[in-house]
Amino acid sequence: MFDDLPPLSHQEQQRAVEEIQKLMAEGMSTAQAIKIIAEKIRAEHKAQSSK
């Protein structure tokens, strides 16, 4: 599941954790929140790589 995630800086990791926690505070399950943020990170990395 996480093999294709790009390496993240500490700041990027912290931002991802905060986004996951926000989704969970809104009632989303941990697994779903992680999935959404992981997909977002992959999409952002793919967009940056294709430039």
UniProtKB/Swiss-Prot annotation:
UniProt cross-references to InterPro entries, sorted A to Z: UPF0181
Source organism superkingdom: Bacteria
Protein family membership: Belongs to the UPF0181 family.
UniProt name for this protein: UPF0181 protein VV2_0310
Lineage of the organism: Bacteria, Pseudomonadati, Pseudomonadota, Gammaproteobacteria, Vibrionales
